[in-house]
Design a protein with these regions (language model features):
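N-terminal secretory signal peptides that target proteins for export/translocation
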Residues: 1-5
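Short solvent-exposed beta->alpha transition segments
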Residues: 36-38, 52-105
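N-terminal export leaders
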Residues: 6-14
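Short, low-complexity N-terminal intrinsically disordered segments enriched in polar/charged residues
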Residues: 12, 20-50
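Exposed beta-sheet edge and beta->alpha loop/turn motif
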Residues: 93-144
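Second-shell loop/turn segments in exported
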Residues: 28-29, 40-43, 57-64, 113-115
Length: 144
């Protein structure tokens, strides 16, 4: 087989491979993107001071760990001194099926580089769990 014919046959194969790799990467990113979108929506509740509503939207594992009234009180004590949100950007997102102290499942740990009116630099960590209803729900929230 001559070189021109080999290139003519290899070209479409290479092109199809190049098109499939980004599609596979997009498919792998899909759970992480959905989890980040859900975390963003949940954080909007927290930013608006709707702490009870944020508890309502949390994962069952989260609700087992802390009652609604205790969550509202704890979040009020942590978030109020920080002041209003100035900026928030996703710093990292990591998919895992195992977390310390949690049952095996599908999780995405999202870290945000955040700035508040009274705290210039903070790291917010929102752990999302894929729950029985097929939705990503918060199973952990930490501010550092």
């Amino acid at each position: 087989m001559n070189t021109a014919r080999r290139l003519a046959l290899a070209g479409p194969l290479l092109l199809s491979w190049l098109l499939l790799v980004p599609a596979a990467t997009r498919a792998e990113d899909a759970p992480e993107k959905a989890a980040v979108a859900a975390a963003d929506a949940w954080l909007k509740l927290v930013d608006a001071g709707k702490y009870g509503a944020s508890w309502d939207e949390a994962a069952p594992l989260f609700k087992k760990a802390i009652g609604r009234a205790d969550w509202e009180k704890a979040l009020e004590g942590v978030r109020s001194p920080l002041g209003g949100l100035v900026s928030r950007k996703v710093a990292s997102r990591t998919y895992t099926e195992s977390l310390p102290g949690a049952p095996d499942g599908k999780y995405v740990v999202v870290q945000y580089a955040t700035s508040f009116a009274n705290k210039g630099t903070a790291t917010e960590t929102v752990t999302q769990a894929l729950v029985g209803d097929g939705r990503w729900r918060v199973s952990g929230y930490f501010i550092k």
